[in-house]
Amino acid sequence: MGKKRSASSSRWLNEHFKDPFVQKAHKQKLRSRAYFKLDEIQQSDRLFKPGMTVVDLGAAPGGWSQYVVTQIGDKGRIIACDILDMDPIVGVDFLQGDFRDENVLAALLDRVGEDQVDVVMSDMAPNFSGMPSVDIPRAMYLVELALDMCKQVLAKKGSFVVKVFQGEGFDEYLREIRSLFTTVKVRKPEASRDRSREVYIVATGYRG
């Protein structure tokens, strides 16, 4: 016999399928509800313009890349990476691999090539154990790697949008971003669940 779902996982599934943004994404045949988070950020911060080059970290299942394609057009370029596989999206150059691995990072940088990137975006998150003392440091490690990517490829005056989980290390990370960008906002999109610790740091005007 199969194992029964725990009460917490059953509650999560119930909440997930009742989520209006999940239902809306399903109706519109979108990859995920994350599409709407980025749309809200774009409406307020205007990060994406036609012809831009964008790096998407933690891309699967593809909600953010799917959205950005609609904003940057045929002349734009998206280089996406995730440890999980992702179904192809026209206009997206996808690399499957663990971004923490030096060889995967080298392959990603090779895909970027000589181009300077206009926007680096990261929706990366670790597999959560339910223990904040374990989960928050893992999450902070990923967002530090995303910021390191900015330092390597982001064009002067470029932008960075990153999902961060509030907890130990958050304030220091925010301070570091403020030292590198001219304008920094912390956003909590409507499609982000209220009880989630996640927020999105939107940083523009990279000092280079």
UniProtKB/Swiss-Prot annotation:
It comes from the Bacteria. The active site is at K163. It is found in: Cytoplasm. It holds the Pfam family FtsJ. It catalyses: uridine(2552) in 23S rRNA + S-adenosyl-L-methionine = 2'-O-methyluridine(2552) in 23S rRNA + S-adenosyl-L-homocysteine + H(+). It is an enzyme of class 2 (transferase). S-adenosyl-L-methionine binds at G62, W64, D82, D98, D123. InterPro entries: RNA_methyltr_RlmE (IPR050082), RNA_MeTrfase_FtsJ_dom (IPR002877), rRNA-MeTfrase_E (IPR015507), rRNA_MeTrfase_gammaproteobac (IPR004512), SAM-dependent_MTases_sf (IPR029063). Keywords: Cytoplasm, Methyltransferase, rRNA processing, S-adenosyl-L-methionine, Transferase. The keyword Secreted does not apply. Transmembrane segments: none annotated. The keyword Electron transport does not apply. One of its GO terms (molecular function) is rRNA (uridine-2'-O-)-methyltransferase activity. GO terms for cellular component: cytoplasm. Its EC number is 2.1.1.166. Disulfide bonds: none annotated. Belongs to the class I-like SAM-binding methyltransferase superfamily. RNA methyltransferase RlmE family. Specifically methylates the uridine in position 2552 of 23S rRNA at the 2'-O position of the ribose in the fully assembled 50S ribosomal subunit. This is Ribosomal RNA large subunit methyltransferase E.
